[in-house]
């Protein structure tokens, strides 16, 4: 099935808004075993939209359009759709009834501008929008199934999931079904991962492997398309053990899980507790720990000791040590971790100190220098790193590196 997506909006072309809708549509369709083969972006220009539809429709089985369905003068998608398909623009009574009910239930007045949102191409099928005023709709133009959705991401996502994916799947020819499996990796580059999995697709009939970088992790997506659910599941089940064997312990999570949820699960399973002392990450590790519901069962506390005085007063880092070694050093990281464990009384304590930039680096300790320390009842270990990138990238990769160290430590507990 050949599918295209079309995003509409001047704000997209100007770079004022990132087009997350196109990515979400492509990813969701891929999960359903469908591939988007082409994507276009045009501005809020009726002629440009009509031309784009005229180009895409004859070459595709389905085109999914987002944007331009609002109540303002620059929302011209419905008019362009009517022109492109040779239909009249008519007041859709079902859409108007829905809109009246939408406003009535909220105690709001229905404005004429909102009523214009119900002017749709003749014989358009409605796509329910529970979250907003824009009327989604679909048309059959020749052999092409045209779908029109609002550009508001939350509205689009719900309509995509509840209505559009089932509609598109119903139009797919053949009984093929798709199963997928997702592995999240940390510690290897995309090229290194590809090298380890080289040849696996050729040796496993029907198995497809794709790679997606979501810095600083990489996702490996296994996909099997077959004539039955059982056959597709069998292909995935046969490929997963081989992938796990080749990738080993760089796999940090599977399915919808993340490294954050993997660490949370291990803390609960092992019955251990954690304290954090952060400097250059500014609480980012603690945020990721507490983003997982139920983390209070194992996370005692997190201290952001950014200034040297805070390291001294709250963690007991000796003033002389800071003066001699500097705040960014293995010795200070070790003292921070030991101090955090002492203050919290936790089983484990992790500390981080480093230079995230853009200033503060030197020849001996350039920007990107980071020290992590992990203390437990047996002692304290320190690791040093030289990360590259801008400030946010250095802080992010530091936080994930810390979580991965916790994950590996818990696996051996």
From Swiss-Prot:
Protein name listed in UniProt: CinA-like protein
Source domain of life: Bacteria
InterPro entries xrefs: CinA, CinA-like_C, CinA_C, CinA_KH, Competence-induced_CinA, MoaB/Mog-like_dom_sf, MoaB/Mog_dom
Record PANTHER family: NICOTINAMIDE-NUCLEOTIDE AMIDOHYDROLASE PNCC, NMN AMIDOHYDROLASE-LIKE PROTEIN YFAY
The species this protein was found in: Geobacter sulfurreducens (strain ATCC 51573 / DSM 12127 / PCA)
CDD domains given in the database record: cinA
NCBIfam families: cinA_nterm, molyb_syn, PncC_domain, PRK00549.1
Family indicated by similarity: Belongs to the CinA family.
């Amino acid at each position: 099935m050949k599918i295209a997506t079309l995003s509409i909006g001047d704000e997209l072309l100007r770079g004022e808004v990132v087009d997350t809708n196109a990515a979400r549509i492509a990813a969701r369709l891929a999960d359903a075993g469908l591939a988007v083969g082409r994507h276009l972006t045009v501005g809020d220009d009726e002629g440009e939209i009509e031309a784009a539809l005229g180009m895409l429709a004859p070459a595709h089985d389905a085109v999914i359009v987002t944007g331009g369905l609002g109540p303002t003068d620059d929302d011209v998608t419905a008019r362009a759709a009517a022109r492109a398909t040779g239909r009249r623009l008519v007041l859709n009574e079902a859409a108007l009834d829905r809109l009246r009910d939408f406003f009535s239930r909220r105690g709001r007045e229905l404005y004429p501008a909102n009523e214009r949102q119900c002017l749709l191409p003749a014989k358009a099928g409605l796509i329910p929008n529970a979250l907003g005023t824009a009327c989604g709709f679909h048309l059959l133009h020749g052999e092409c199934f045209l779908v029109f959705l609002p550009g508001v991401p939350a509205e689009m996502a719900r309509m995509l999931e509840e209505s559009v994916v089932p509609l598109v799947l119903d139009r797919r020819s053949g009984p093929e079904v798709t199963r997928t499996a997702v592995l999240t990796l940390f510690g290897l580059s995309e090229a290194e991962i590809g090298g380890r999995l080289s040849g696996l697709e050729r040796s496993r009939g029907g198995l497809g492997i794709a790679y997606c970088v979501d810095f600083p992790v990489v996702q490996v997506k296994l996909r099997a398309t077959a004539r039955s659910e059982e056959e597709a599941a069998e292909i995935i089940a046969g490929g997963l053990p081989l992938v796990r064997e080749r990738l080993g312990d760089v796999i940090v999570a599977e399915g919808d899980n993340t490294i954050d949820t993997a660490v949370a699960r291990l803390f609960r399973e092992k019955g251990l507790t954690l304290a954090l002392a952060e400097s250059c990450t500014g609480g980012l590790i603690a945020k990721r720990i507490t983003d997982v519901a139920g983390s209070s069962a194992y996370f005692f506390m997190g201290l952001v000791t950014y200034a040297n005085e805070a390291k001294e007063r709250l963690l007991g880092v000796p003033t002389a040590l800071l003066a001699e070694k500097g705040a960014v050093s293995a010795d200070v990281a070790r003292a921070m971790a030991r101090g955090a464990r002492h203050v919290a009384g936790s089983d484990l304590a992790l500390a981080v100190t480093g230079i995230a930039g853009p200033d503060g680096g030197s020849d001996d300790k350039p920007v990107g220098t980071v020290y992590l320390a992990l203390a437990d009842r047996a002692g304290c270990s320190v690791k040093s790193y030289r990360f590259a990138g801008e400030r946010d990238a250095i802080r992010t990769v530091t936080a994930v590196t810390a979580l991965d160290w916790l994950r590996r430590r818990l696996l051996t507990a």
